[in-house]
Amino acid sequence: MRTKYCGNIRISHVNKKVKLCGWVHKVRNLGQFIFVDMRDYTGLVQVIFELKNYTIFKKALNLRNEFCIQVFGTVQKREKKNQNIKIRTGEIEILANVLNILNTSKSLPLNFTQENNDDSRLKYRYLDLRSFDILENLKIRNKITYLIRNFMTKKNFLDIETPILTKSTPEGARDYLVPSRNHYGKFYALPQSPQLFKQILMISGIDRYYQIVKCFRDEDLRSDRQPEFTQIDIEVSFMSAKKIRNLVENLIKKLWLEIRNINLKKFPQISFHEAMKKYGSDKPDLRNPIEIIDVSNIFKDKKFISFFNLNPQKNNRIALLCISKGAHLSRKKIDDYTKYVQRFDAKKLFYIKIKECKLGCLGIHSSIKNILDEIILKEIIEKSQSKNGDILFLIADQEHIVNKSLGMLRLKIGIDLNITKKNRWEPLWIVNFPMFDKDIQGNLSSVHHPFTAVKNMDREILKNSPDLAISDSYDLIINGYEIGGGSVRIHDVNMQKQVFDIIGIKKSMQNEKFGFLIEALKYGAPPHAGIALGLDRIVMLLTNSKNIRDVIAFPKTTSATCLMTNSPSTVDNLLLQELAIKHLKK
C-alpha cells in the first residue's frame, strides 16, 4: 500500500513518485491549494492538493483531522521561503495525484494542540499514543530493550522465562491472586518478582540468567509505580557483589551513552547509614549539594535538651541545613517551610540568618537567638561553614524524624532556589543496609527480602545479635530514583532457615511457602547474587518524562484501573461459581 514512510522522505527523493499511508494531522485550505500535514509513526510530511486537479481536490475538501488516508504523488522541493527547518521533511512536499480515504474519524475527544487531562488521555489511549511525544518514548523504550539484550548476550547471559502463574509467597507487597478452576479453592499468584525461580536456576547450574519480565504488586501507587511493571532481572553464580555492581554499572553507562550521548562517571558508593545521616534518605538526589550537618554535640548541654523539649530516653538528633545565600528568604517563606516539615512530624523548624559573621550574635537574626552565646554560635558557623548571607535551618527531634524532615526540606529548597542541577546525572550505589528492621512491637522483618545474605557475621553471632546484622545488598540510585536493588543470596540451607526464624516465619509456614527452595538448597547450591532494575523508571529518566505512565503503552491509573477497557470489572456469576468464589457484601 505504500513505498515510503512520511517522515523518511528527503531532498534526495525530489521528482520520485511515492505512495504514502497515514493520518491527517492538519488541514489548511488556501483556496487554490489544500495543504495537508500527513503523519505516520516516522513523522510528518506536507501534501499539496491543487485546484487544477479538481477531481482529487474535491475529494480533499472532505478531509478532517485523523482521517486515515493513502496518497500517491511526486516529491518536489519547496520554495526557500516555504521551507520548515523545524521538521526533517521541511525541505520537500508531496504533490498529490491520487487520494484514497481509507477511513474517516469522529471529532476527537482529545486536542493535540494543548495539554489534555490524564483521565481523557488514558480513556482514549489509542488516540493519545498517536502523539509524537508518547510515540517517541515507546521508540526509545524499544531501543533500550534492544541494547540490554545485546549487552547481556555478549556477556554470555541466557534469557530464560520464568512462570507467571506461581505460588503466593510473602515478599512484602500484596499478591494478585488467580483462582484455579481445576484445583477447587486453590489460587495461583502473579509474581512480584522471579526471585525464587532465578535462585532455583542458579542451583540448576544456569550460570548466568537474565530476563526482561513483567511483575505484579498490589500496592498503593504513585507517579513512578504501576501495579504491573517491567524489570530487568539478573542472577549470576560465583560472582561477588562488587562484580555484579560493575556489570550493572557498565550496562547503565552504555544505555546513557547510546540514548543520551552522555558519558557517566564512575558511580560513587556510600553506606545506608551515611546516606541517612547526610541526606535523610536512602535514595539521595546528589544533583543537590546540600547536606545535613549534625550539631548534636554542640547542643549537648541540658539547657538545650530542655529548650528543644527532647526526651532523653529517645534516640534524638539535632541537625541543620546550610542554605547558601538564603538569608533573603522572607518570614512567610520560612513559615511555609515550617508547615512543610510538620508534615513529616517535625515539631518546629528553627532558623539562623547570618548577616555578618564577624559580629557574632549581633550579626544574626534567629528564632533561637535567646539561647545562643558567642561560643555556641562560633561552633555552629565553623561546623556548617556558613558565610554572610546564608541561612541555617535546624530541627531537634527524634533521629528518624530529623532525618526525614531535613531530607525532604533539602529536596524542596533545592528545587525552590534552583540549587538542584537539573541537567546533571548523579548515579550512586547505596550499600551496607541493615539486615533487619524492627517495628513498634519489636518484631524483626527483612529490609530487602529474606533471601539476602548477611555480610558481617556468622550464624552464631546472627542468632544472638540480629539487630547488628548488615546485609550484603545494594541499591542503585539515579537522581533520587531507586533504579534497582539486589544482593548476594543465602546459599546455605541452615542460614536460610535461621533468617526465616528471626523474622518470625514459623517452621510450618517455611515448609508450606518455601519448602521447594529449602529442599533445593540442600543439593550443592552455589554462591550466587543478583539484581533487578526497573525498566520503566530507566525509560522515564532517559526520556525526561515526568510520569512513568508516559513510557508505558497501556498504563493504569493511580487507583490501578484501566479507563480504556474499564477494568477491573465484574464477571458473570457462572464463572464465579465454577471457581467457588462468592461476593461478600462490604
Curated annotation (Swiss-Prot):
<feature type="region of interest" description="Aspartate">
    <location>
        <begin position="195"/>
        <end position="198"/>
    </location>
</feature>
<keyword id="KW-0648">Protein biosynthesis</keyword>
<feature type="binding site">
    <location>
        <position position="171"/>
    </location>
    <ligand>
        <name>L-aspartate</name>
    </ligand>
</feature>
<dbReference type="GO" id="GO:0006422">
    <property type="term" value="P:aspartyl-tRNA aminoacylation"/>
</dbReference>
<feature type="binding site">
    <location>
        <begin position="217"/>
        <end position="219"/>
    </location>
    <ligand>
        <name>ATP</name>
    </ligand>
</feature>
<keyword id="KW-0547">Nucleotide-binding</keyword>
<dbReference type="InterPro" id="IPR004365">
    <property type="entry name" value="NA-bd_OB_tRNA"/>
</dbReference>
<feature type="binding site">
    <location>
        <position position="489"/>
    </location>
    <ligand>
        <name>L-aspartate</name>
    </ligand>
</feature>
<dbReference type="GO" id="GO:0005737">
    <property type="term" value="C:cytoplasm"/>
</dbReference>
<dbReference type="InterPro" id="IPR006195">
    <property type="entry name" value="aa-tRNA-synth_II"/>
</dbReference>
<dbReference type="Pfam" id="PF01336">
    <property type="entry name" value="tRNA_anti-codon"/>
</dbReference>
<dbReference type="GO" id="GO:0005524">
    <property type="term" value="F:ATP binding"/>
</dbReference>
<feature type="binding site">
    <location>
        <begin position="534"/>
        <end position="537"/>
    </location>
    <ligand>
        <name>ATP</name>
    </ligand>
</feature>
<protein>
    <recommendedName>
        <fullName>Aspartate--tRNA ligase</fullName>
        <ecNumber>6.1.1.12</ecNumber>
    </recommendedName>
</protein>
<dbReference type="InterPro" id="IPR004364">
    <property type="entry name" value="Aa-tRNA-synt_II"/>
</dbReference>
<comment type="function">
    <text>Catalyzes the attachment of L-aspartate to tRNA(Asp) in a two-step reaction: L-aspartate is first activated by ATP to form Asp-AMP and then transferred to the acceptor end of tRNA(Asp).</text>
</comment>
<dbReference type="InterPro" id="IPR047090">
    <property type="entry name" value="AspRS_core"/>
</dbReference>
<dbReference type="InterPro" id="IPR045864">
    <property type="entry name" value="aa-tRNA-synth_II/BPL/LPL"/>
</dbReference>
<keyword id="KW-0030">Aminoacyl-tRNA synthetase</keyword>
<dbReference type="Pfam" id="PF00152">
    <property type="entry name" value="tRNA-synt_2"/>
</dbReference>
<dbReference type="InterPro" id="IPR004524">
    <property type="entry name" value="Asp-tRNA-ligase_1"/>
</dbReference>
<feature type="binding site">
    <location>
        <position position="482"/>
    </location>
    <ligand>
        <name>ATP</name>
    </ligand>
</feature>
<dbReference type="Pfam" id="PF02938">
    <property type="entry name" value="GAD"/>
</dbReference>
<keyword id="KW-0067">ATP-binding</keyword>
<dbReference type="InterPro" id="IPR002312">
    <property type="entry name" value="Asp/Asn-tRNA-synth_IIb"/>
</dbReference>
<dbReference type="InterPro" id="IPR004115">
    <property type="entry name" value="GAD-like_sf"/>
</dbReference>
<dbReference type="InterPro" id="IPR047089">
    <property type="entry name" value="Asp-tRNA-ligase_1_N"/>
</dbReference>
<keyword id="KW-0963">Cytoplasm</keyword>
<feature type="binding site">
    <location>
        <position position="226"/>
    </location>
    <ligand>
        <name>ATP</name>
    </ligand>
</feature>
<dbReference type="GO" id="GO:0004815">
    <property type="term" value="F:aspartate-tRNA ligase activity"/>
</dbReference>
<feature type="binding site">
    <location>
        <position position="448"/>
    </location>
    <ligand>
        <name>L-aspartate</name>
    </ligand>
</feature>
<dbReference type="GO" id="GO:0003676">
    <property type="term" value="F:nucleic acid binding"/>
</dbReference>
<feature type="binding site">
    <location>
        <position position="217"/>
    </location>
    <ligand>
        <name>L-aspartate</name>
    </ligand>
</feature>
<dbReference type="InterPro" id="IPR012340">
    <property type="entry name" value="NA-bd_OB-fold"/>
</dbReference>
<keyword id="KW-0436">Ligase</keyword>
<comment type="subunit">
    <text>Homodimer.</text>
</comment>
<dbReference type="InterPro" id="IPR029351">
    <property type="entry name" value="GAD_dom"/>
</dbReference>
<comment type="similarity">
    <text>Belongs to the class-II aminoacyl-tRNA synthetase family. Type 1 subfamily.</text>
</comment>
